[in-house]
Amino acid sequence: MDILSLGWAALMASFTFSLSLVVWGRNGF
């Protein structure tokens, strides 16, 4: 696995996680 693709995967994962966290916060969990 390339280090660049690994970094992109981590970035997308953290972005999706934070996005879902914001959505949950707006819905009152």
UniProtKB/Swiss-Prot annotation:
One of its GO terms (cellular component) is cyanelle thylakoid membrane. One of its GO terms (biological process) is photosynthesis. It is a single-pass membrane protein. The keyword Protease does not apply. GO terms for molecular function: electron transporter, transferring electrons within cytochrome b6/f complex of photosystem II activity. It is found in: Plastid, Cyanelle thylakoid membrane. Keywords: Cyanelle, Electron transport, Membrane, Photosynthesis, Plastid, Thylakoid, Transmembrane, Transmembrane helix, Transport. Its main location: plastid. The chain crosses the membrane at residues 3-23. InterPro entries: Cytochr_b6-f_cplx_su8_sf, Cytochrome_b6-f_cplx_su8. Component of the cytochrome b6-f complex, which mediates electron transfer between photosystem II (PSII) and photosystem I (PSI), cyclic electron flow around PSI, and state transitions. Belongs to the PetN family. The 4 large subunits of the cytochrome b6-f complex are cytochrome b6, subunit IV (17 kDa polypeptide, PetD), cytochrome f and the Rieske protein, while the 4 small subunits are PetG, PetL, PetM and PetN. The complex functions as a dimer. This is Cytochrome b6-f complex subunit 8. The lineage of its organism: Eukaryota, Glaucocystophyceae, Cyanophoraceae, Cyanophora.
